Amino acid sequence: MAVKIRLKRMGAKNNPFYRVVVADARSPRDGRVIDEIGYYDPVKQPAAVVINEEKALDWLKKGAQLTETARALFRKAGVLQKFQQK
């Protein structure tokens, strides 16, 4: 089973809010998820990025792949550097 770390859109129209989730690569964007590991709120100034580092590193060690957007958020939060150091 291919597992990806990606964003799940939440919120209202014109007021998006995203959850950073671990999901099967074949499931729909807002479909069933395996685990929620954080959130991203682009509406706040500055944009809020909160990621549970312990869960994120655990999933990356298990082989979960990051989408481009999730990779940018992980880089911004400093999680990607910690994973590459280990």
Curated annotation (Swiss-Prot):
Give the gene symbol: rpsP
Record-linked Pfam families: Ribosomal_S16 (PF00886)
Q: Which GO terms describe its molecular function?
A: structural constituent of ribosome
Q: Per the similarity annotation, which family is this?
A: Belongs to the bacterial ribosomal protein bS16 family.
Task: Note whether Ribonucleoprotein occurs among the keywords.
Answer: yes
What does the entry list under GO cellular component? Answer: cytoplasm; small ribosomal subunit
Keyword annotations from UniProtKB, A to Z:
Ribonucleoprotein, Ribosomal protein
* Record NCBIfam families: S16 (TIGR00002)
Keyword tRNA-binding present in the record's keywords: the answer is no
- The domain of life for this entry's organism is Bacteria
PANTHER family, per the entry: 30S RIBOSOMAL PROTEIN S16 (PTHR12919), SMALL RIBOSOMAL SUBUNIT PROTEIN BS16M (PTHR12919:SF20)
The protein depicted here goes by the name Small ribosomal subunit protein bS16
Set out the biological process GO terms recorded for this chain's protein: translation
